[in-house]
Amino acid sequence: MKEELAVYFIAGTQDIVRGTLPSVLEEALKGGITCFQYREKGAGSLQTASERKEMALECQKLCAKYQVPFIINDDVVLALEIGADGIHVGQNDEEIHQVITSCAGKMKIGLSVHSVSEAEEAERLGAVDYIGVGPIFPTISKADAEPESGTEILKEIRRAGIKLPIVGIGGINEANIAEVLAAGADGVSVISAITRADDYQLVIANLI
C-alpha cells in the first residue's frame, strides 16, 4: 500500500483548468502517478449521479490501462457499483463504521484525519488501510479545508506509534515535498500541483 501512496493524484471536473479530466488524468498516468482518487465535489462539479458514474467509469478505465489504483471519494454506492479499488472518506463524510461494514474486504479504505487522536482511532478500527493527514500547508483546492497543521502533525502521529501508511495532503508541491516525507509521510496527495501545472509530467517527475 505504501508504494501506491507515493504520488496520489486527486481530482474531479471542478479542478480542471485546461482540457478535460480524462485528458489530464491520462497525462498524469503517463507521468507516473501511483494512485488516483476521483473526487467530484464543490462548485463546477458534476451534479447528477449518472454524470458522475459516466466520468468515474472513464477514469477507472484509464487507471486500469496504466495499472494504477482507482479510488472514489465519499460515494460508497458508486464505488461498490463499479468495483473501484478503494473508497476514501473524511471525518464528516459517510460514517466510517458504515463504510467498513459495506466495503471491508472488497476494496481499500482510506480515512482523512486531522489529529493524533483521530489517527489512533483509525488504527484501532482495524479495517482502515491508510490515512490522509492534513492539510499540511494552505490549500486552494478545498474551500472547506481545516486550518493547515504544518509537518509537525506527521511527526506527532509517528511518535505516537501509528503504523498505518500515511499520505500527506494540502498545499504540497515540488518545493516542499521533501519536508513532508521527512516528517513521516509515505507519500503525498496533490490536486492543484498537477491540475494547474504547465507540464504535468515534469511536475510528477519532480514529485517522485
Swiss-Prot record:
Disulfide pairings = none
Pathway this chain belongs to: Cofactor biosynthesis; thiamine diphosphate biosynthesis; thiamine phosphate from 4-amino-2-methyl-5-diphosphomethylpyrimidine and 4-methyl-5-(2-phosphoethyl)-thiazole: step 1/1
Q: Which reaction does it catalyse?
A: 2-[(2R,5Z)-2-carboxy-4-methylthiazol-5(2H)-ylidene]ethyl phosphate + 4-amino-2-methyl-5-(diphosphooxymethyl)pyrimidine + 2 H(+) = thiamine phosphate + CO2 + diphosphate; 2-(2-carboxy-4-methylthiazol-5-yl)ethyl phosphate + 4-amino-2-methyl-5-(diphosphooxymethyl)pyrimidine + 2 H(+) = thiamine phosphate + CO2 + diphosphate; 4-methyl-5-(2-phosphooxyethyl)-thiazole + 4-amino-2-methyl-5-(diphosphooxymethyl)pyrimidine + H(+) = thiamine phosphate + diphosphate
Q: How is the cofactor bound?
A: Binds 1 Mg(2+) ion per subunit.
| EC number per UniProt | 2.5.1.3
Q: Which residues bind 2-[(2R,5Z)-2-carboxy-4-methylthiazol-5(2H)-ylidene]ethyl phosphate?
A: T139, I140, S141, G171, I191, S192
Q: Which InterPro entries does the entry mention?
A: Aldolase_TIM, ThiamineP_synth_sf, ThiamineP_synth_TenI, TMP_synthase
Q: Which family does it belong to?
A: Belongs to the thiamine-phosphate synthase family.
What is this protein's record name? Thiamine-phosphate synthase
| Species of origin | Listeria welshimeri serovar 6b (strain ATCC 35897 / DSM 20650 / CCUG 15529 / CIP 8149 / NCTC 11857 / SLCC 5334 / V8)
